Amino acid sequence: MQSYWFGDSEDGRCSPFSGDANAIVSRILSLPVQMDTFTPPDWQQAVSCGFCSNRADYLARLQAVCIAGSERSVREHYSGKDAELLQMVRTLDEIDTVINLLSERAADWYMVRHPAFSRKYRRTPANILVRTIREKSRGALGRVAGEIEQLADTRTALAKEVSARANDVLPNTSALIGGLVAARLMANAGGLLPLSRLPASAIQVLGARTALFAHLKTHTPSPKHGIIFQHRRVHNAPRDIRGRVARVLAGKLAIAARLDYFRGVAVPEFLEPAQERIDTAGKSEAK
């Protein structure tokens, strides 16, 4: 028996498939295809099978099936458990950018009003600087500073949600490097599936695109780490062994990402020795 998207043919007889476009898509996805014996059908076969009345009808139904298949693919893509986390991380990054830009602009504006406000005050923490501007300014500048503070509160709340969501979507990766860093790593890769496909060497420099292209173009020293630099074991490591620590961490993260994608639950038998290896990475070389 030869099965096509519009019906089944056997011994010269054809039975048309009855169902809407979505049912046909499900049928297509379930059909086994043997390419060595498969013969592409034409519209005349579909007419002979009783599936459609003429070529125009065939093309119209084929178009409906293609649209239904595309819609299903889009739904599956955006219904993935990492889809919302991806948007949350990107929103968090945008909020960070907006806060930094507005804080700089507010400080410049305040300096115009108060020339004695020298740059040494700009070395203070941003939250203290913005609060000072809000308390000592009236009118629009004070309101802008207030909006920055509210945006900072929103940013803090969103960061907590991102971390909590990452613990659910990336349980193993989050256990190794923390929810927020794990989420940023996944977002930079483009999703959980792309992250799970990356080798350890790519994960190690993920987020260091500028430095990597500078290395390829101008032969500057290659980057030793990207986003994973935010992990305490990497940024606290001595400079001469930091690259080795980053390699160990990236190797464990490559495995963790695959476990997150294919299993979706924390794997203690992996996490315990992996965490121990990360904690001791570089110690022997440092002696």
What does each model-found stretch correspond to?
Residues 1-18:
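N-terminal basic/disordered segments at the start of proteins
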Residues 38-155:
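Long, charge-rich intrinsically disordered scaffolds of nucleic-acid metabolism proteins
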Residues 89, 156-175, 187-194, 201-202, ...:
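Extended, structured, electrostatic nucleic-acid-contact surfaces
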Residues 187-261:
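Phosphate-backbone recognition surface of nucleic-acid-processing proteins
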Residues 245-287:
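Acidic, carboxylate-rich catalytic segments that either coordinate divalent cations
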